[in-house]
Design a protein with these regions (language model features):
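Catalytic core of non-heme Fe(II) oxygenases with the double-stranded beta-helix
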Residues: 464, 468-578
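Short beta-strand-to-loop acidic/aromatic patch adjacent to the donor-nucleotide binding site
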Residues: 224-239
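Non-heme Fe(II)/2-oxoglutarate
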Residues: 396-484
């Protein structure tokens, strides 16, 4: 087998940084000498493997790619020919089989084993620690908005937290969607001056995906001061604030952080290609995505977020039309052209970096469309709209009992409250507050309010999902022995105003239990208000924005809405299990 611990990673790091010391075992020196041989092309993974110290053996294996697999042994891994049941010393690939060589090179010779993990991932790094801000590499970041995407505002909020000197960053923002123009403009208005330079192309330029990406890369290629190009698509949720530093420190010509879609095996890389050049699942794909194998992996395809050395753009990747193809999508065309030039694409899962939001069901017909993403992007929805202290409730650390069998706990973030109120006011069709109400069964409301029902804004399914996910567990905890599926014929937002409807007369709710969520703040947005339970002579007057009162609806908890004396008060109400 190959006796050197050197690997493709070291060869790649040395190839574009010849002044750096990679003299371990002399392996990189041999790689560099091989590359200078005018008679041979040592740009492929197979050639790099051959330029390692391999003991010559008369047995060479000329087999199809699927006949050579990995054989994991105690503390080491070898190539195995399953057709002949042999352990070849030399593995050579031509044409498309070179991708299989790249795959094998992720493991052999002893690059990754179950016992040691990755043995070479921390070699040849480029530490940034200790550098002055002015000494940091200059990075051009390309941000691409190609379709209507949820949580764009959150993307820019998170982008601001990226741990990298902003005066060493240039931005190229391409937005194809008129729907997102206001969010881009607001970000640039408030924070654009923090960056060394900003270039924006909007939907009015009618530039397609391939053209915008080609242009962004070319801007870096032609800028002598540009050291790196960092692609960041708008659907990327970059949770690790040190991502850019981590990728630069990997010191590879092309490296991407592994990100996945929450709860799914979908990721931003492919472990293998089919014969037609499309997705194929490699043997190790699931283990890499689920974190059972951790390392830096040579792969045939990446997308969404990746870092390129600018020196690579000025050497191997000088073609302007990297993203163009008559038959392939731009991202596939790009990776095809990268592979054609013999450039390795690496993806790292050495740390957790983030995830990708789904754009499949995103609708743009509402004021705050992200509210409707509880099904498609539940993790992002929770981070945006559920109170940051919600999880403490289940450990009894944050729940109050202001009145008998009345529980008070945080449920919504301020953003959720604001968005629900604004969505209702944007819809604008408030009821008249009379007993006659054609929206409900029977057409008569005994205790009318001025309100808008959730089904009027097509939010009924999403609201029911919210109740099941976040209210039902608390109900079952606080009312032992009671289990609910949150059947809710009435879900609505009530508006109280002194000159409209300031209060609500004493009544029982048509429910087993009621959820009553305060959507704005007393003494800030309104004065007065609150709820009084008459049987217990117990009042909650200082309601808290985003907190819910949960109480029985019938028989015991006869209650009234106290007068709102100033401003406008909003509450969200659900009658659960009538």
């Amino acid at each position: 087998m190959f006796s050197s611990a050197g690997d493709i990673l070291r060869c790649e790091r040395a190839r574009l940084d010849p002044e750096r010391d990679f003299s371990s075992a002399g392996d990189i020196l041999r790689c560099e000498r091989a590359r200078l041989d005018p008679e041979r092309d040592f740009s492929s993974a197979g050639d790099i493997l051959r330029c390692e110290r391999a003991r010559l053996d008369p047995e060479r294996v000329f087999s199809s790619a699927d006949e050579v697999v990995l054989k994991f042994e105690d503390g080491r891994v070898r190539a195995r020919n399953v057709l002949y049941d042999t352990l070849p010393v030399v593995v050579h690939g031509n044409g498309p089989t070179k991708l299989q060589i790249n795959y094998l090179g992720n493991y052999i010779p002893n690059i990754w084993t179950f016992e040691t993990g990755c043995t070479a991932c921390n070699e040849g790094l480029l530490p940034l620690e200790g550098l002055q801000e002015s000494e940091y590499p200059l990075v051009l970041i390309g941000i691409f908005i190609q379709k209507p995407t949820p949580f764009v505002t959150v993307f820019f909020e998170r982008f601001l937290k990226l741990q990298y000197p902003k005066n060493r960053l240039k931005l190229f923002i391409h937005n194809q969607e008129a729907h997102h123009e206001s969010q881009v403009s607001l970000f640039l208005k408030d924070y654009g001056s923090l960056y060394q330079d900003v270039r924006v192309s909007g939907p009015e330029e009618e530039m397609d995906t391939a053209a915008s990406r080609n242009l962004a890369i070319d801007v870096c290629r032609k800028d002598e001061g540009c050291d790196y190009f960092f692609t960041l698509d708008i659907e990327v949720v970059l949770k690790n604030e040190n991502t850019l530093k981590i990728l630069i420190e990997q010191n590879l010509p092309f490296v991407a952080p592994m990100i996945t879609r929450a709860g799914r095996l979908w990721s931003n890389f492919w472990g293998a290609l089919s014969a037609e050049g499309y997705y194929a699942r490699s043997e190790d794909y699931v283990d890499i995505v689920q974190g059972r194998r951790v390392g830096v992996w040579n792969v045939p395809y990446v997308s969404s977020v990746y870092l390129l050395k600018a020196s690579l753009l000025r050497s191997e990747l000088t073609d302007f039309d990297l993203f163009n193809s008559d038959i392939l999508d731009p991202d596939m065309a790009f990776c095809h052209n990268i592979r054609k030039q013999g450039v390795f694409m690496f993806v790292t899962n050495m740390q957790t970096f983030g995830r990708i939001v789904s754009t499949e069901t995103y609708q743009t017909s509402h004021l705050h469309n992200d509210l409707w993403q509880i099904f498609e992007n539940p993790v992002d929805w929770q981070e945006r709209y559920i109170h940051e202290n919600y999880t403490y409730i289940m450990s009894d650390k944050l729940i109050e009992t202001p009145c008998p069998d009345v529980y008070w706990f945080p449920i919504f973030s301020d953003v959720a409250c604001d968005h629900i109120v604004e969505e209702m006011e944007h819809f604008g069709k408030w009821s008249g507050g009379g007993n006659t109400d054609v929206r409900i069964q029977g057409g008569y409301e005994n205790v009318p309010t001025i309100d808008i029902h959730m089904n009027q804004i097509n939010f009924e399914k999403e609201w029911h999902k919210f109740l099941l996910e976040y209210i039902a567990p608390i109900t079952e905890k606080m009312y032992p022995g009671y289990y609910t599926k949150c059947a809710t014929p009435l879900n609505f937002v009530v508006r109280y105003k002194p000159d409209e409807q300031p209060l609500l007369a004493p009544h029982h709710d048509a429910s087993t239990f009621t959820v009553n969520i305060a959507l704005n703040s007393k003494e800030v947005d309104y004065q007065g208000g609150g709820c009084r339970f008459l049987r217990y002579d117990c009042s909650i007057e200082a309601t808290r924005k985003g907190w819910t009162l949960m109480h029985p609806g019938r028989l015991t908890h006869y209650h009234e809405g106290l007068p709102t004396t100033g401003g406008v008060r909003y509450i969200a109400v659900s009658f659960v299990d009538p």
